[in-house]
Amino acid sequence: MLTIYTSGYSYSHKHCCALVIWFCEKYLPRHKIEIEVLHRGLVREGVYGWCSIQDCDWRPRSFLIEIHNRLSKEDYMKTIFHEMQHILQHIRGDLRDKRGIRCWKGIDCSDLEYSQQEWEIEANQRELDLYEEYLTENS
């Protein structure tokens, strides 16, 4: 079961939900998860979006995606898929936060630069694949 909440401004609720539902039905069909997508200006932060756990670090099931509200349609879709990939990584247990330490597949990766973080490398690679897959299936 999937529960989606959306909020913020300058976004399409219908489009946002369609992307999240598509991903969850395809890649997380048997998981009970709750996802809140908050649309807001992220200019000062210098990011398109990010994902955080809302409940516990062990077997998380509640997530918050914050996404920049002034992205092009293509960048918006890719960013949603990028952040959904992080949710998948958390649910699989590949990506974990333990007492302030970020672990990838059980290895402490807290000191790695952004470009060296395996979970970001994977999400960056997958966002384009997911974007193209979604367009192919929904055109």
What are these regions (language model features)?
Residues M1-Y11, I33-Y48:
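Hydrophobic or amphipathic, alpha-helical segments that drive membrane association/targeting
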Residues Y11-K32:
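Zn2+-dependent metallopeptidase catalytic core
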Residues Y27-H31, D94-R96, Y134-S139:
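Surface-exposed helix-capping loop/turn segments at secondary-structure junctions
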Residues L42-E74, I91:
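Active-site scaffold of zinc-dependent metalloenzymes
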Residues E74, H90-I121:
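Post-HEXXH active-site segment of zinc metalloproteases
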Residues K78-H90:
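Active-site recognition of the HExxH zinc-binding catalytic motif
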Residues E113, E127-S139:
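Long, well-structured alpha-helical subdomains associated
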Residues N124:
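Short, conserved alpha-helix that lines the donor NDP-sugar binding/gating region
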